[in-house]
């Protein structure tokens, strides 16, 4: 079978460069396009060189329609507005769209859902094996404990991250809510400040820390009377997300249109 032809969106970004490196070291995939923002000073530069590799001849472009003509998939770790624009093109082309972008609003998520009758989308706030296993464990623990155990999700990321809570924190919150059979939107406590009043029983709390170069730390704390259970994951290198995204693209290649998650890719949906 021929190699899966992939476009990296946000090729000049932190994840974009990691994805270019991951593609170069993975069998069965090849980089055929590199997308950057219109007006970016990186347009025209070589994606390999930007990723710290030898030149690979793939120049950064802002024209996804042209790039996608000969592609099988797009790996998209950009910003919500770009991802929403890319969704329409990927759907029209019928190519796999792996979405790692976080900070998507509920209306962004509705747009993504609306194209999945013709698009093959794998979307997750975190593409690593470890975090998806953590999510499965969180769901199981939340199912076993009653609301006498307060659930708090704490995350820390590098100083350049622009959204909070992280996509991973929200994914873990969804897992905890699923374990408790409640809707996260009705039970989340975000951004406490000032005289907040006592904690509401059943809330799932979120706290975000930013600083330095932290790749991504997440903890789920189950705080009960006189005891606490803590589940945690610490990402040490962005390559775990990049390799996860490639696994997702290869898994989705040839699948029916639909909206899939990393739990589907990793076989953890029924864990
Ligand atoms: N799901 C997961 O496993 C992971 C998700 N992420 C998420 O991925 C996203 C990117 O993270 P990161 O790489 O650190 O961020 P960066 O800011 O380093 O990279 C984003 C890149 O996207 C580019 N971009 C902006 N607009 C467009 C556009 N219209 N078309 C193409 N490219 C565009 C930016 O260009 P410019 O700088 O010129 O604006 C930038 O190069 C974030 O939402 C982050 O939370 C990150 C790691 C793992
Ligand atoms: O912006 C990042 O860096 C990361 N973003 C994702 C998130 O929002 O959870 C995944 C990872 O934690 C790194």
Curated annotation (Swiss-Prot):
The gene is dapB. It comes from the Bacteria. It comes from Rhodopseudomonas palustris (strain BisB5). This is 4-hydroxy-tetrahydrodipicolinate reductase. Gene3D superfamilies: Dihydrodipicolinate Reductase, domain 2 (3.30.360.10), NAD(P)-binding Rossmann-like Domain (3.40.50.720). One of its GO terms (biological process) is lysine biosynthetic process via diaminopimelate. The keyword rRNA-binding does not apply. Pfam families: DapB_C, DapB_N. It catalyses: (S)-2,3,4,5-tetrahydrodipicolinate + NAD(+) + H2O = (2S,4S)-4-hydroxy-2,3,4,5-tetrahydrodipicolinate + NADH + H(+); (S)-2,3,4,5-tetrahydrodipicolinate + NADP(+) + H2O = (2S,4S)-4-hydroxy-2,3,4,5-tetrahydrodipicolinate + NADPH + H(+). Signal peptide: none annotated. It is an enzyme of class 1 (oxidoreductase). The keyword Disulfide bond does not apply.
